[in-house]
């Protein structure tokens, strides 16, 4: 039928339609050209440059450099500092991800349940997300100060004679940074879970009550949690990526110390590139970091995606 209508149209009309189609395509191309140029200059070009630098011995300011193949990656395997940074990053992600997801989900459930002051609590929980990380890190530096910090002052009131040195003790520094990371991510996760909760049809809860579901725990187990599957997968992926990218708090509060106890991948990458001026080695760490993030997203999507989407 469409072919018959097309054949019945005058040739002049078809030619005009083709001209309009070409004109619209040209206009669309011109409108997208600035964004395409910006995308190439700000994302693709730096990414390509990083990949190329990862296989060189280039140092910042040097006039000469050479191709060294995978020597930078071989050095990484033997670099004790890199191994420590990788281990600390894994521990940090393992601390921040589950705690911030559980607390974010708990906050979202309380707010969705209609608790009093829900707007205030929503703003308070979301405050760390919209605050400057460096400014918040400075505030945490005061709160965790071993002598004048409010936290240790409170512990002394409780009878703790020797409160921990939160940011200058190898035993406590990574836990302290992890607690700050949880605080930073809870509000963001809460908003995502609130969006997921609002999308659950109310009829499902009514049907569950008809089937004999009485307690909130049963409603959560049988309705809420299964229907939050896609949201939970997204929150898990985003939280792990945000955690593995930790840099600001480390740079402001500890600079990787004491004795590399809080050294993480991005801080190592920064030091190698802009302190030791070894841009080639820094680019190799950057490339490995990018591959880790992409691999993490791929594994989570492949392993969990089929289990949480319902058709």
Regions found by a protein language model. Give the residues of each.
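Short, Lys/Arg-rich, polar N-terminal cytosolic tail immediately upstream
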Residues: 1-23
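A structural signal for multi-pass alpha-helical bundles of membrane permease subunits
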Residues: 27-311
């Amino acid at each position: 039928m469409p072919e018959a209508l097309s054949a019945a149209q005058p040739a002049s009309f078809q030619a005009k339609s083709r001209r309009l189609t070409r004109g619209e395509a040209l206009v669309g191309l011109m409108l997208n050209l600035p964004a395409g140029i910006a995308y190439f200059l700000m994302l693709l070009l730096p990414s390509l440059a990083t990949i190329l630098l990862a296989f060189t011995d280039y140092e910042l300011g040097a006039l000469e450099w050479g191709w060294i193949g995978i020597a930078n990656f071989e050095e990484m395997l033997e670099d004790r500092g890199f191994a420590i940074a990788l281990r600390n990053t894994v521990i940090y992600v393992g601390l921040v991800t589950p705690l911030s997801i559980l607390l974010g989900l708990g906050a979202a459930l309380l707010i969705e349940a209609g608790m009093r002051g829900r707007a205030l609590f929503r703003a308070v929980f979301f405050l760390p997300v919209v605050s400057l990380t460096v400014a918040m890190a400075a505030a945490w530096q005061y709160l965790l100060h071993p002598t004048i910090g409010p936290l240790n002052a409170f512990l002394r009131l409780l009878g703790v004679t020797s409160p921990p040195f939160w940011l200058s003790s190898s035993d406590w520094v990574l836990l302290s940074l992890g607690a700050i990371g949880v605080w930073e991510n809870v509000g963001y996760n809460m908003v995502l879970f609130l969006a997921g909760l609002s999308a659950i049809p109310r009829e499902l809860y009514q049907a569950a009550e008809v089937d004999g579901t009485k307690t909130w725990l049963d409603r959560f187990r049988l309705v809420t949690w299964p229907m939050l599957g896609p949201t939970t997968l997204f929150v898990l992926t985003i939280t792990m990526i945000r955690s593995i990218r930790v840099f600001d708090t480390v740079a402001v509060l500890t600079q990787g110390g004491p004795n590399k106890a809080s050294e993480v991948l991005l801080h190592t990458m920064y030091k190698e590139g802009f302190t030791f001026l070894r841009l080639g080695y820094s680019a190799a760490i950057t490339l490995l970091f990018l591959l880790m993030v992409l691999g993490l997203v791929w594994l989570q999507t492949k392993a969990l995606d089929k289990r949480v989407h319902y058709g």
